[in-house]
């Protein structure tokens, strides 16, 4: 028998110490990685619940194990809320991650060797959109489109490549693109060549849910997303679609048993919490502020003479090119880290450095907005970052910024009393 008094603190001091240090880091550091956010205590409560004990292969009402009557209720809640949130007719909440959701889509609708047309990783796409190092680039014939000299997706190039290569599927989505995707144009191109349109909205799902970014569901054959990032839920995946019995059946089979076994019902419960939170009016206010904050930060960098890829942002993220300053993203990342500002190095278009070094930084505002930052704080923060980038090895500047970071983080904690 287990005692509920047997906590990690009592049982495993080494692990508990590391967990506490990470919790302190999250409170004391400013988080600007575009794919990170902070979940609510309710989301974490669901993930740490007794649901982790339950095996439930199959789908609600069609399980291969007994004792699933309550997890059926939980999973159906998550499904229904996801459909309501995004205006979808179909939702599969079982994918363990966004990459697994994407793999399931490929498995459902493609054959090995089929051609896919996706955004180049070097131009802001994602590994799973056909990058050579990913299974999506190994199992399928991946053709890549990119951005033009102004940092915008070249839709004429997308159409030209589609006509030339006749892909079975066109992939729209990104990991580092700061503009609005033209879903109607993607749909028209897909229809012209008889391709499926698959949209990966992992980065902007929260913005879509709040109505501050266009919804791809009415245009795409299938849509995937993660449930963290801007959606602010647990780490996991989600597949959405309009009504199509054939595609729905293929997607369900591709998730289970095609690529996964038992679903993580404790994570699915956390997804249900997340979807309920995203259906509230205050979530729209939050997402509007996320975009305002990103625009405010990008504006400061432009004023200080830095190159923002695409000239600004229309969503939650933007890329900063440091080619002109001859600074590597790796060195900039490390210097900002010493000031308790967490970012990630990122390749930029025409980057002369390797992906392990890069010449750019990616910034995102979901996490700082969750802790209460508004435009004023974000402009001040961007100024501090510019000060460090202007003199990367000046430890006095880094030390001064770190103290300012600690002060503002104490004023605006992630988790209050």
From Swiss-Prot:
(6S)-5,6,7,8-tetrahydrofolate binds at residues 121, 125-127, 354-356. Pathway: One-carbon metabolism; tetrahydrofolate interconversion; Amino-acid biosynthesis; glycine biosynthesis; glycine from L-serine: step 1/1. One of its GO terms (biological process) is tetrahydrofolate interconversion. GO terms for molecular function: glycine hydroxymethyltransferase activity; pyridoxal phosphate binding. The record marks 228 as: Plays an important role in substrate specificity. Its main location: cytoplasm. This is Serine hydroxymethyltransferase 1.
């Amino acid at each position: 028998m287990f005692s509920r008094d047997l906590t990690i603190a009592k049982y495993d001091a080494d692990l508990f110490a590391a967990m506490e240090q990470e919790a302190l880091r999250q409170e004391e550091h400013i988080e600007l990685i575009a794919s990170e956010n902070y979940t609510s205590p309710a989301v974490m409560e669901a993930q740490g619940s007794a649901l982790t004990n339950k095996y439930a292969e199959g789908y609600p009402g069609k399980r291969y194990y007994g004792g699933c009557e309550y997890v059926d209720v939980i999973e159906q809640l998550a499904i229904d809320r996801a459909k309501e949130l995004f205006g979808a007719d179909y939702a599969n909440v079982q994918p363990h991650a966004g990459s697994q959701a994407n793999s399931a889509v490929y498995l459902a609708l493609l054959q090995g060797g089929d051609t896919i047309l996706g955004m180049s990783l070097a131009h802001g796409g994602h590994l799973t959109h056909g990058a050579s190092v990913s299974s999506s680039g190994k199992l399928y014939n991946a053709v890549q489109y990119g951005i033009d000299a102004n940092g915008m997706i070249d839709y004429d190039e997308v159409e030209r490549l589609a006509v030339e290569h006749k892909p079975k599927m066109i992939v729209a989505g990104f990991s580092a693109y700061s503009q609005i995707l033209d879903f109607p144009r993607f749909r028209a191109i897909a229809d012209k060549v008889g391709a499926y349109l698959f949209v990966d909205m992992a980065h902007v799902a929260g913005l879509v849910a709040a109505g501050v970014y266009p919804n791809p569901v009415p245009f795409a054959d299938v849509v995937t997303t993660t449930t963290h990032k801007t959606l602010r839920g647990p780490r996991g995946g989600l597949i959405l679609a309009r009504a199509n019995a054939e595609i729905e059946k293929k997607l369900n089979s591709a998730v289970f048993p095609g690529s996964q076994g038992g679903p993580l019902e404790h994570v699915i419960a956390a997804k249900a919490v997340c979807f309920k939170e995203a259906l509230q009016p205050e979530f729209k206010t939050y997402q509007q502020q996320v975009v305002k904050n990103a625009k405010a930060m990008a504006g400061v960098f432009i004023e200080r003479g830095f190159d923002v890829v695409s000239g600004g942002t229309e969503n939650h993220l933007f890329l900063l090119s440091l080619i002109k300053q001859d600074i590597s993203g790796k060195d900039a990342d490390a210097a900002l880290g010493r000031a308790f500002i967490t970012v990630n190095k990122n390749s930029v278009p025409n980057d002369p450095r390797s992906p392990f070094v890069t010449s750019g930084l990616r910034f995102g505002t979901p996490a700082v907005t969750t802790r209460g930052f508004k435009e004023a704080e974000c402009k001040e923060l961007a100024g501090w970052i510019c000060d460090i980038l202007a003199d990367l090895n000046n430890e006095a500047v880094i030390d001064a910024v770190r103290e300012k970071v600690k002060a503002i983080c104490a004023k605006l904690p992630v988790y209050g009393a």
